UniProtKB/Swiss-Prot annotation:
GO terms assigned for molecular function: iron ion binding
Function: Could be a mediator in iron transactions between iron acquisition and iron-requiring processes, such as synthesis and/or repair of Fe-S clusters in biosynthetic enzymes.
InterPro entries associated with the record: Fe_traffick_prot_YggX, Fe_traffick_prot_YggX_sf
Protein name, UniProt field: Probable Fe(2+)-trafficking protein
Species of origin: Burkholderia multivorans (strain ATCC 17616 / 249)
Keyword list, A-Z: Iron
GO biological process: cellular response to oxidative stress
Transmembrane segments: none
Top-level taxon of origin: Bacteria
Family indicated by similarity: Belongs to the Fe(2+)-trafficking protein family.
GO cellular component terms, A-Z: cytosol
Record bears the keyword Iron: yes
Organismal lineage: Bacteria, Pseudomonadati, Pseudomonadota, Betaproteobacteria, Burkholderiales
Keyword Iron in record: yes
C-alpha cells in the first residue's frame, strides 16, 4: 500500500515519495510533506529554471540557487518563474 501524506504544496492527502529526493534536512522535509504529484511539478519547474537561466549545475552557486528555489516552491511564497514563460491555456 502506498504511503499517504498531507501534501504541503497541494493542500490535500496524496501518495508520498518513495524516498527522500535530496540529501540533508530539506530532503527529509520534502519526503515527509510533499507528494509524488507535487514533486513532478517541481521537476518541470526546475527544468525551466535551469534552461531559461542557463544554469551550470557544476557551479556551486547554481546548485545553491536551485536548493533555495526548491524550498520556496514547497514551503515558501513560490519559486521564481522562468522569464517569458506563459502557461498553456485550455481550449
Amino acid at each position: 500500500m502506498a504511503r499517504m501524506i498531507q501534501c504541503a504544496k497541494l493542500g490535500k492527502e496524496a501518495e508520498g515519495l518513495d524516498f527522500p529526493p535530496l540529501p540533508g534536512e530539506l530532503g527529509k522535509r520534502i519526503y515527509e510533506n510533499v507528494s509524488k504529484e507535487a514533486w513532478q511539478g517541481w521537476l518541470k519547474q526546475q527544468t525551466m529554471l535551469i534552461n531559461e537561466n542557463r544554469l551550470n549545475m557544476a557551479d556551486p552557486r547554481a546548485r545553491q540557487y536551485l536548493m533555495k528555489q526548491t524550498e520556496k516552491y514547497f514551503f515558501g511564497e513560490g519559486a521564481d518563474q522562468a522569464s517569458g514563460y506563459v502557461p498553456p491555456t485550455e481550449g
